[in-house]
């Protein structure tokens, strides 16, 4: 079976969804920009040699509809002979895109693929056009479709206090801002055109979603966002609404070396699981355990983790049940996470994987794990190994 390697991984800056940098930039343009950039950064691979493009996106309607993967590829002037498909596993879409491409390469059906994802939550809101079947309420609690309430449920089940959530959220912003100031994101962010507050067109090379002024004291003043009576989850401890895209060049190790391209990491194992929709945020626990089992590793073997921060109330139970509470500051989301950077749904799987690869190199660790929860009760995880 072919070894699957990540040759390159990049992303756009994360823009605020409400009047942010990309308010006049379409999702297809964000995607096409990264496709062009990946190919330009790796000229040894001709675009025509790509076997497929796998692109994650959740709200596949309006500008994100009608197979945005293909539309973006056409905009990027990828040869017409290269196919493209849009993947949807909700929050795990672009990580699923990676898994789909990896399996094609493992079986010998492909040698080189572009993978990634996008979500413009400012142009296509998360709730746009959603119409759940009424019959679902016979099998699933109605609140299972409200992500904030599933986070409230996890907080109650696992004893996650408001104070713990506020502290974790403040940490996310502090870590992300420190990473920005130190240049830790420079290797992953591709400058991207957008508009500043005055409408001036400029190139953005930083995440505008981060709020460096965030403090635990300020977060403590916010009202509960989903359960106004007894809730603990606030807007400040939830992932920010943002617009962005991320992309990776995935190849067989043999083809990469044949072309003189240096692999950055191998895909060691992959896993996806289902869980109770009412605690959808718990999905990373069984997904990570399964991925580790497939890799023949334990959590202690992993040097750094990237765990998507849908909510502080959601990620803390996952950290706890993976036995990592004492290692948060050494191993978990060292450059902040979605609470600070935002969670553009279809983009996030590739985004956290991209950040993870850079952290693995910076920390000089052999193994890294990226994982995320998925709305309606799923979890997805990938173990990477440095080459």
Swiss-Prot record:
Q: What is its EC number?
A: 2.3.1.16
Active-site residues per Swiss-Prot or TrEMBL entry: 91 (acyl-thioester intermediate), 343 (proton acceptor), 373 (proton acceptor)
| GO BP terms | fatty acid beta-oxidation; phenylacetate catabolic process
GO CC term, one of those recorded = cytoplasm
| Highest taxon listed in the record's lineage | Bacteria
Recorded catalytic reaction(s): these are:
an acyl-CoA + acetyl-CoA = a 3-oxoacyl-CoA + CoA
> What is its subcellular localisation?
Cytoplasm
The protein's matches in SUPFAM superfamilies, at most eight in alphabetical order, are given as: Thiolase-like
Tell me where it mainly resides. Answer: cytoplasm
Alphabetized, the UniProt keywords read:
Acyltransferase, Cytoplasm, Fatty acid metabolism, Lipid degradation, Lipid metabolism, Transferase
Q: Which HAMAP family match?
A: FadA
Q: How does it assemble?
A: Heterotetramer of two alpha chains (FadB) and two beta chains (FadA).
Among PANTHER family, the record links this protein to:
3-KETOACYL-COA THIOLASE FADA (PTHR43853:SF11), 3-KETOACYL-COA THIOLASE, PEROXISOMAL (PTHR43853)
Per the similarity annotation, which family is this? Belongs to the thiolase-like superfamily. Thiolase family.
- Function, as annotated: Catalyzes the final step of fatty acid oxidation in which acetyl-CoA is released and the CoA ester of a fatty acid two carbons shorter is formed.
Its protein name is 3-ketoacyl-CoA thiolase
Species name: Escherichia coli O1:K1 / APEC
Recorded name of the encoding gene: fadA
